[in-house]
Amino acid sequence: MQEWKEKIRIVRGRLAWASLPLCFCGLVLFDAALRFFYRAAGSTRFLDWRAFVFTGAWSLLLTGVAALLPPLGRRIAMGVYAVFFGLLSVVHGVMFNIFGEFFTFSDTNFAGDGAKFFSLSYLNLRKALVASIVLAMLLLAVGAWLVPKRQPGKPRWPRLAGASGAILLSLVSVVLLNRSLLPQADTMTWGSLFDPNSEEQAYKDFTDSNRCLLMTGLYQYTARDFVVSFGLEASPVDLNSLDQFYEERAGQVSGENEYTGLYEGKSLLMVMLESIDTWLLTPEYMPNLYALQQQGTNFVHNYTPLFLSAGTFNTEFISQTGLLPSVTGLSSSIYSTNSFPFSLAHQFSQQGYTVGSFHTASAGIYSRGSIHQNLGMTYHSGAEMGMDDYMLDSQMMEGYDMFIPEGPFFSYIITYSGHGPYTEEMGNISAPHWEAAQAAVAQSGVESTPANLEEYTHAVAHAMETDQFIGELVAQLEADGRLEDTVLLFYTDHYGKYLTDKEFLYQLKGVSADSPELYRTPCFFYAKGQQPQTVEKYVAPVDLAPTIVNLFGLDTDTRYYMGDDMFGDQGGVVLFPDGGWYDGETYYTSDYQGEVTQEMRDTSAMARRREEASFNTLRADYFARREIS
């Protein structure tokens, strides 16, 4: 045994020179593996020189920092690199699998709440990627093991000088390349065209995580994302520019139309459906909801873009305020502290309506208790409604008298049972409907692997639970004579993103990964006695607030909404993050390669200006500072 230890010591001593090169190679491998296996996530080539320069410079910098440390510190540094960047690579992969976008530090605003819904099924990473991450960690581990002990008498200045030179070279490279990618100060204007081919604009905004990671590599992406996400380089908001925007906006909103005041005096039951995608809303799976859709005013071109990775809160906030949340640079606390005088709850409350919000989860999830209070409505959890199992939407009927009070009311309900994962982890949702779901799926003609079909069956069973609640709710409204004076609005928070196999999801929706149709979701009003109607206009949740205030005849200044009345003569363009948009013909994003017309330039200027105005309104707490109410 002693002989083997001596041999290992000798080998370790002879290979000590390889410690720092192994550290460098391990760091490079983390980036190369992530970008190679997700190279289809954007239009940037894997061999793009900027990513390799950034990665080489950052890897050299981190290796140089380790080299400056004493042996124990060097080993610790390499261990930290291995664990941190290994986990970060896994997080990027998981986030991309779920949301189709890489991780950004802005996601940490809601990370604690999102973690409560985490499932091991989301760790479905490619084996080759996992192997590459493990190999990179092993390279760093071996590099740490090979770090030589202190050698008294041996001069340290060559190592320190070399490390300092490497750090200096790395910093110069990163700074120069960073500056070259940023646009000149006089080339960017608030209303300028979103040029999908402008690398400078994408790098400045740094909101397109896929494009930016592929363009800059793992390490520069991490550093710049941290700076942008936490607003460390944000300049003060120019309130005068916002004043000008809203003055111009006053002349752009739709005026009164044939739908103005159509529902005046009626109550509104606004129901946001958790994960009820188009492929679930069928007569076989959700007969109650489907019947209401066919009898109501159906918006067949409704889309729910995700400005935040917290998809439910994303659509919740947008639909209640008519504002678009900032992708980066804002603390989640602004939703609880900013002034939102034009929220739907405040507008209905001013008309004497009883207002409230209802969801099965606790008030702490996404800080709904404080946020909803700030928006003007009291939040009621499943426990307050008397539910035994918060996962079962049908048990929300225990709180019926709370969300259907006497007199006119505005009640906001968020369902839960459609939530993923679609596995046995939430088997208590599936169980009451499992046999019915199996029978319906067997008749559907949907074909895939056994694993996919099992998930699909769970998803159908989850939807059936939500449909049971809707059926019981409408029946009780009818029995109580309240259906005649109550308008129901149903819309979905986000597409059905919880299926593990995304190709199977695309098959179900009949779309490709980069199609805007992936984001098309149900949205319709139902009012008893009203003739069925199909609306072809292209709309989104940001259009709900101005539509509702017009339908209910509320005296609201709609210039302060970023959307447009769904029945008005304005709008018809769906705003996507990063300045993108879709009007049914053109999907204008960073991947757009066609001819750019003047009309498209005008639409891009509008989309970009509205998004930035909304972000700056939130950043500055504009309504409070201008005392607008």
PLM features: residue spans?
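A diffuse structural propensity rather than consistent per-protein peaks
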Residues: 94-107, 126-127, 231, 235-238, ...
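Extended low-complexity intrinsically disordered regions
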Residues: 221-258
